[in-house]
Amino acid sequence: MTWFTPDVIDAIIAVVKAIVVLLAVVVCGALLSFIERRLLGWWQDRYGPNRVGPFGMFQIAADMLKMFFKEDWTPPFADKVIFTLAPVVAMSALLIAFAVIPITPTWGVADLNIGLLFFFAMAGLSVYAVLFAGWSSNNKFALLGSLRASAQTVSYEVFMGLALMGIVVQVGSFNMRDIVEYQAQNLWFIIPQFFGFCTFFIAGVAVTHRHPFDQPEAEQELADGYHIEYAGMKWGMFFVGEYIGIILISALLVTLFFGGWHGPFDILPSLAFFWFALKTAFFIMLFILLRASIPRPRYDQVMDFSWKFCLPLTLINLLVTAAIVLLNTPAGSVQ
């Protein structure tokens, strides 16, 4: 009797895939900080980081060494357990959310029938990390930043979910692979669900606290917000987690609205990973371009925009989509 039964082999393959995806996402998140600084320098007609190594390519290594050797300081007035737990929860929730994203027809950590719901569960968990960080720091700026962040995230997650319900109504499934295959047989959802795409993208920028929705950590107002008391590797986990969030939202946009691993007009279907990576990189660049080009609105304007514009738009989009699907459904199949 051998231990290497088909079930054991499948489990080993699943673990290896999970480790590879985990390492790739963390490395890409770290590299993205350097890429962002170089792109911002290029777009703003100035030099980016160019001192460490040729063309500044080793800047990320220098930053990692500096962060690794910094004192891992915990304020004496902080709640030490929750203070330490907050960055771990923040980064873990984002990494676990990648489990349901199908990268190619054969690559993906988990093929869940409730893939979209799993993503929203992990997104909701990240709110607790922000609250933990702000409250446990025992700092008024950190607490105010965490309250801003939690209110903003909860507000935008409401219509982030509603923006995707039009897709669920059309496909009839929460499974990510089913959504990708549906787009391969029909139009990419960027066309029939254009308003859903716009609102989901806006919500994605807001829940990752990226510019112009970075009020929770606005340096001019809150002195870096809810991670003002963090240093060393704890701060680094929040920092890299922000870029991992950008990659996650970009990958979701590609999966849900741009055909996933399929190329336009099914060009070169054998290059599934290339198409997925290319489209994801485009949206990552768009995130960075927003930081370089759009001013930051006031916090009350951000909240008004969420509840008074985006929420009604997503509800109208969902109602219209449901009506069209119902009218196109044969009478005998309606239960």
From Swiss-Prot:
Localization (cell): Cell inner membrane
Top enzyme category: translocase
UniProt-listed Enzyme Commission number(s): 7.1.1.-
GO cellular component, one term: plasma membrane
Protein origin, superkingdom: Bacteria
Membrane topology: Multi-pass membrane protein
MF annotations from Gene Ontology: NADH dehydrogenase activity; oxidoreductase activity, acting on NAD(P)H, quinone or similar compound as acceptor; quinone binding
Any single Pfam family the record assigns to this protein: NADHdh
Disulfide bonds: none
Any single GO BP term: aerobic respiration
Protein's job: NDH-1 shuttles electrons from NADH, via FMN and iron-sulfur (Fe-S) centers, to quinones in the respiratory chain. The immediate electron acceptor for the enzyme in this species is believed to be ubiquinone. Couples the redox reaction to proton translocation (for every two electrons transferred, four hydrogen ions are translocated across the cytoplasmic membrane), and thus conserves the redox energy in a proton gradient. This subunit may bind ubiquinone.
HAMAP family attached to this UniProt entry: NDH1_NuoH
Similarity comment text for this entry: Belongs to the complex I subunit 1 family.
Protein name as catalogued: NADH-quinone oxidoreductase subunit H
